[in-house]
């Protein structure tokens, strides 16, 4: 799988996980409709399925995915919560993405 496809799949996977956690949060903490649990559960099912599509060992996938998840969560903070990320949020996201790239794309024999 190409690097671009891998990162794109990580981003979609992170979006599914974040949405799957955010929707129950809205019900529990903000008094929104209990019906949000249905799309939340479906989103988490999609998240698990998407993780299974990654072409490398599960442990490596989970470790690298964390870097993309961090960046997607900061993007969610900005676009959904309306909170502008700080410089340190952005720096941390970039560091996490560099870590993801090293884990996923470094040459290896196995």
UniProtKB/Swiss-Prot annotation:
SUPFAM superfamilies: Multidrug resistance efflux transporter EmrE
Pfam family, one: UPF0060
Primary location class: membrane
Record key words, sorted: Cell inner membrane, Cell membrane, Membrane, Transmembrane, Transmembrane helix
Keyword check for Cell inner membrane: yes
Any Gene Ontology CC annotation: plasma membrane
Membrane-crossing residue ranges in chain numbering: 7-27, 33-53, 63-83, 87-107
Subcellular location(s) per record: Cell inner membrane
Domain of life of the organism encoding this protein: Bacteria
Membrane topology recorded in Swiss-Prot or TrEMBL: Multi-pass membrane protein
NCBIfam families: PRK02237.1
Family affiliation: Belongs to the UPF0060 family.
Name the UniProt record assigns to this protein: UPF0060 membrane protein Psyc_0916
Organism: Psychrobacter arcticus (strain DSM 17307 / VKM B-2377 / 273-4)
Lineage: Bacteria, Pseudomonadati, Pseudomonadota, Gammaproteobacteria, Moraxellales
């Amino acid at each position: 799988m190409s690097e671009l496809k891998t990162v794109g799949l990580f981003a979609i996977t992170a979006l599914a996980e974040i949405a799957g956690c955010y929707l129950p949060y809205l019900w529990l903490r903000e008094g929104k409709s209990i019906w949000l649990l249905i799309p939340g559960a479906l989103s988490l099912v999609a998240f698990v399925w998407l993780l299974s599509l990654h072409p490398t060992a599960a442990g490596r996938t989970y470790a690298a995915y964390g870097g993309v998840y961090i960046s997607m969560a900061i993007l969610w903070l900005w676009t959904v919560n309306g909170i502008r990320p700080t410089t340190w949020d952005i720096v941390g996201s970039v560091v996490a993405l560099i870590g993801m790239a090293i884990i996923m794309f470094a040459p290896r024999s196995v």
